[in-house]
Amino acid sequence: MPSPPYLGRFAPSPTGPLHFGSLLAAFGSWLLARHAGGQWCVRIEDIDPPRAEPGACERQLRTLAAFGLHSDLPVIRQSERDAAYTAAITRLLQTGQAFECSCSRADLAGMGGIHHACVAPLGERRAVRLRVPPQPPVGFDDALQGPVLQDVYAEVGDVVLRRADGYWAYQLAVVVDDAAQGITDVVRGADLLDSTPRQMVLQRALGLPQPRYLHLPLMLDRDGRKLSKSHDAPALDDADPLPALHAAWAALGQESDALPRHAAVETVLQHAVQHFSPRLLPRQRELDLDERASGLQRD
């Protein structure tokens, strides 16, 4: 049976403007999709309203457009996918693969942070967890980082699918949506590398296909922290995308002189597709941000 055509994705959360770390993931996933002759889509992971910033979704989409990164398919918003997540959880509950849980954070701390059995009686606030029984370690071969092996039972325990506050958990939503959209290749930051084995356990429980995975290096700021909105990472400049595009190209390990310095964004992206080489991608989990080289200096 032939493999389905390549479909990659970029899935930001609307917690603020896109920054250089976001661009690295978006540009990297877009380039890999184009290199494979496939498609690339955008999904907005807006399932955590308390963390969402008003207007961030629209701003993120405008930024992607300014950088020439247009979704080949209609943009999906997870906040509109309640029915799909409910169906998945209902199925798991009915088959005994998931259960309701009222254990508090204090209860979980008493278990060493790993849930294997409920210690609290069911109350009004109930999370839903995937039952993770003892099993052999889960492994996969990341296309960039190499072999990954994790004992999900011992290191993670029962995985939260719906939080006690009623919001959907990331692990459930991402697994359901990757399958529903037919995503064949997940390209994202290495901070999510350790989440992949638990997602694979959930994929198996739901009988869903497993995409291929490639985890790009995580961009660190000058203090050695993940470049993120919570750490005040500077927003990308929609009015002047070329410096950040060139910096992202270099951070992805590509030949710096392959892209024209002064050209339209579309022309730069055409050259990027022509000269992109996956074998040059840096095979490490973290990269230090060179603010001077990236053109992202603060005023």
Curated annotation (Swiss-Prot):
Motif 'KMSKS' region, chain ranges: 226-230
Record-listed E.C. numbers: 6.1.1.-
Binding site residues for Zn(2+): 101, 103, 118
Co-factor: note: Binds 1 zinc ion per subunit.
Sorted UniProt keywords: Aminoacyl-tRNA synthetase, ATP-binding, Ligase, Metal-binding, Nucleotide-binding, Zinc
EC class of the enzyme, as a word: ligase
GO terms under cellular component: cytosol
Listed name of the protein: Glutamyl-Q tRNA(Asp) synthetase
Organism: Xanthomonas axonopodis pv. citri (strain 306)
